[in-house]
Curated annotation (Swiss-Prot):
The keyword Transferase does not apply. The lineage of its organism: Bacteria, Bacillati, Bacillota, Bacilli, Bacillales. It holds the Pfam family Metallophos. One of its GO terms (molecular function) is hydrolase activity. It comes from Bacillus subtilis (strain 168). Keywords: Signal. Residues 141-277 form the LTD domain. SUPFAM superfamilies: Lamin A/C globular tail domain, Metallo-dependent phosphatases. This is Uncharacterized protein YvnB.
Amino acid sequence: MRKYTVIASILLSFLSVLSGGHHESKAFPVVQQELFQTPHYIPLLENPPQIDVKAEMRSNLMIEAQVRDNSYQAFSAFLFYKQSNELGYKMVPMDPTPGAVRKFLAQIPKRLIWNSELEYYIVMSNGKQRVESETKKLKLEGYQADLAHIPELLITELAVDTKNIGRADGYEFIEIFNTTDRTIDFKDYHIRYRYPKEGPDSDLIWRPDERILIPSGETFVVWLKPAGHPELTSADFNRYYQTQLKEGKNLAVIDETEGMANTRPRAVVISTNTGKDISVAHYRKHALRRLSSVLYKYPLNGTAELLNISIGEKNPSPGTVLQAQVPDQKRKIKLDKEKPVIEDLTDRKPVRPAESIELRADIRDRSLVKTVAFYYRTDENKPFKRILAEKDRNDNLFHYIVYSPELIGKDQLEYYVAAGDGINEARTPVKMIDIKQTSKAHGLRMNIENRDTLSGTQFLKATTEGRADSIKLWIDGKKQVTEPAMEKEVYFAFDTRKTNLYFKNAVTMEGKVLKVFDDTTNKYRTYSVPLPETLLRKGKQLQRITIRSGSKVSPFDTAENRDDFLVKNARLVLSDGTVIRDQRVSPEKELFIGDNQRSNKSWQFQFNLPDGLFTSQLLEWDTSKLSEGAHHIQASDGKENVSLVVRVDNSGPHIEPNITEGQTYKGNLILQADMYDKWSRIEEAEASLDGESITLPYHTSSSDLLPGKHSLKVTATDLAGNKTVIERIFKTEREHPDQPEVIDSEADTHKAKLSVRVKDPTNDAMDVGFYRGFQYTARNHVKIFKHASLTEPPKSFVPERETPFTNKELERVSAADGKTVSTENKELFPYHRFEVTVDPSIDENDLAESVWKGSSLPGRKVTMYAWNYRTNEWQPVDSFVAKDDKPFTLKASVIAADFVRESKMNVIVQDEIPPAKDMYTFVWMSDTQYYAESYPHIFDKQTEWIKDNQKQLNIKYVFHTGDIVDDSADIRQWKNADRSMSVLDKSGIPYGVLAGNHDVGHKDGSYRAFGKYFGSDRFDKKFHYGGSYKNNRGHYDLISSNGNDYIMLYMGWGITDEDIAWMNQVLKKHPDRMAILAFHEYLLVSGNRSPIGEKIFKEIVKPNPNVVMVLSGHYHSAMRKTDELDDDGDGKPDRLVHQMLADYQGGPEGGQGYLRLLQFDQANDMVHVSTYSPYVKDKNYYDTDTYGNKDEFSLSLDLKPRIKKVETDYFECNVYTNEELGKREQVKSGDTAEFRWDHLEPQSVYYWYIIVEDSFNGKTKSPIWKFKTKKETYRPAPDQFDFRHVSNP
């Protein structure tokens, strides 16, 4: 009621202003409008004060007015404007300018401006007297059209709500205007009636029967005569509108139409026969006045979208246009003498009857190709069929499929292609495609061949030219009981359209599903279904076949929403091409199947097959009851005999792996298997090792495999379809040597003896290599800094305002002794950075290992990052989730080439301490497809509102759960979506998107267009973007707010097992973050999960205890479902998982901009969910009186802030160089290996390590050890002695 109260208030204010004087002549002139009687007269003020007016064109036209006289206190103001003298003034209420006195502001939305000149004046009132400004004219830039880009044909007027004839509008019409300097033949065009929500593929096509010629600069009217009224003539039309239009000259009639909707948004389009929109006229529901018309003007922006300049202001005037509707000059058409060039791309190789033929052509012309037609026939004695073809939006070619039912029983197909540009026409020569029909056999025959290999249940069939009951059949001399059958396959064919992807629509017979058709089909497509021979029985009065509308669960499901589609031309097609129909149904009658009001959930067809068609005898033969090997089959009809020998093979191939069950293997290992089949050949083979697929032979080693048991599984399938699976369990020992034990590092002044004891778990001899190393701690060559950053990790290498550790702090972290340094922050993410200065001799291939020891709080994840100089980013190298507050270690190794520059290496260890403030908000958008297609201003309104309310609502994040656009092949829609979502980019508001089914190729699932506009490169520089999967097919965002840490995990349309594995991997890496999962499809309109939703729930939601919420769209509804999950197996629920569906695209204007707000209330551990439309400024799409809290409710969620810290106990950096000092070979297990390191500097610290390897690829690296050489003792040289002080003996 709030909306209508506001409207009524404005209207009454408007009427009070208009209630006196000459102003009625300027006011909104509506023909036949009822006059309002107002009790109060507000006179015009004598000697009125001056009104100052200022106009400015921004995103909208802004007009501000102020009364100069301080004594006149206006409380209301209205702007009156017009854009053409042929149309009256329109009124816009003016709002008081905030913070100003006697100032008012009006906005005219840019979309309502269609002329370069605008005339306006302003009326103000204080309730007793009113003042009026002078009339002004305003020149507007950018509203002049380029004549060369104006469409050649315009829709200038629609009359969609006229006097009824019976129950239908009797005199609806479409007025067309020719803008060119030549007469246009309408044969290359047609009219399309469009449902904006469903797109062009669902258009109704209207083509007048008679030829239409539209002279230059003149109009032509098309009358949509209602169905069931053949008595109406053009005289009735002229009488109703008081016109003198002549049928065939400037009036055409389209009979038997359902007309145009009066109360729903629709579009009328003039299109070429190739599908190119020339003019598009939209009208919306509630915008029409009965018995009035809608007027349009040529577009100014070079598109086909006509400008709506008048709704309900004028009475219909078929055949007459206003000057404002059409350009001042005629568009000149250049002389064109070139014919289109046709390249026939049809594959003309012979086809089998069960196959279809696709006719394909590439057609080019300097002018617009307006008509393309395929002509074909399968009988040379009949005329060619003409099929108009539209350009395919995926490959820009022209296609038409001749489906198999038209080819069965035919020998060849003749065809040619014709194309025209409105002036010139080209055509190809007639070409032929052979159809390989099975040659008709004669005499007694069977459906198997001599020496065939058979298995399982076989249908043996014998046929003769005579009576079928004369046929007898024997197997191994034993007579068999048979039944009559048809020799060749029978096909059930039907045409269907408007089916939707993944709905399990089906053809069934006697309760058996013969075919599921679950593809998206907007245009009629023919399906052909072979019928099981066991279901077609002689003597049955009728063969009954059912087409069922399915849900996404099953063709027989009764609980969920069913698909709605149309079917026509259902028939049986016999092998000779004979067509048998259900006599109750006309072939061209469209049958509605589904669960809407005018549909049947299923339709059963009945066909009569004459007994004369059953010319065979059939045996259902179970070969598994016989021995394997050769068997003799005989058939006789009393005149002829047929004798065959077949092989029965019901056992699988023989497989012999080279692995012995239970044996232990060492060293290199080649896995392979011998395979053969006694009765036929091996058709398919595959193998796996420990569940992972491998290709035999497979090379591995005991050092590559974990110690313990392993499984080799080999599967082979033979020609008869028999399968054998063999599994061998084998073992490998612990192959790698034990960690070596340092014995001594006896250091002298210039040398040191290095001694280690080595052991191997299987007593193998080992080679021991001695290598140089380096080690750095807080005591030497390591500087440590502390700080807190806005993100985790920091975006820059060295953030500003870092603080170095004091000497006292450095001493505390120089040993792993429990003495720590802790850094905390109330707002940002604290970290410690370690800058290590390494020895200049370190090579780029050397390995640098960082070891950090410290502690955190239970449940917290602490991450170590190393700075990658090549990619200029902090790269995560190790992490740990603390189970308690006890110390733990982070350790990681990196290659010096990417992580050391100018002898410097940098590592940080980071955790977070977020703030605890007020409530924060996440916004959730979904299924914006119709905004991108038809209502981009609504899309803009959504994101602009999010930007404008970011601070007020404390908006931290925005979800989009897919169907960003309606047609992934339409670049215009992607550009609209890109522009709208860029508002969030420019405002710095974190958001994530995924691809819905409309964002990918409907048939091939291609993500190309999605990746171009919303791929990973759009997001990878944003602080919240955690990681991408297949160019943003999936991704995750990391968001923290008010002490709550989230991971937002997305996966787009067409989820596979590989996708699920990736999602589980990501969730396991972030167990300390609450996970909100986003998919396009998950919940159904019933509140249950869809099949893919159930799979996600079982394989992702349940195993990951941090998942708390799942969001989805796709289905036109709003639902929620909460599950209690027991994570620790004690029988008590440990968490709630809230699953929600929100998709409003089924509403007016594609959903009218409704979006979800999730407000997180930490004080009460609740998430308050509400629904709001910035476009209509209204809460709750679903009325609360009818639907209750469907759109507004609260969910329970633990939102207590979790305190975190980074606390360091010890840090060291170990560098393992490739500098080999020496080597000892074939050292026995348990023995000591020694090496003397010479040429050392005195009183110096040296680091070293060893690598131990055995001959079976076992390899172990030691820790880094150190020693210090002795101080050199000074001894004078002989020539330095003073012999004068040496006494003789």
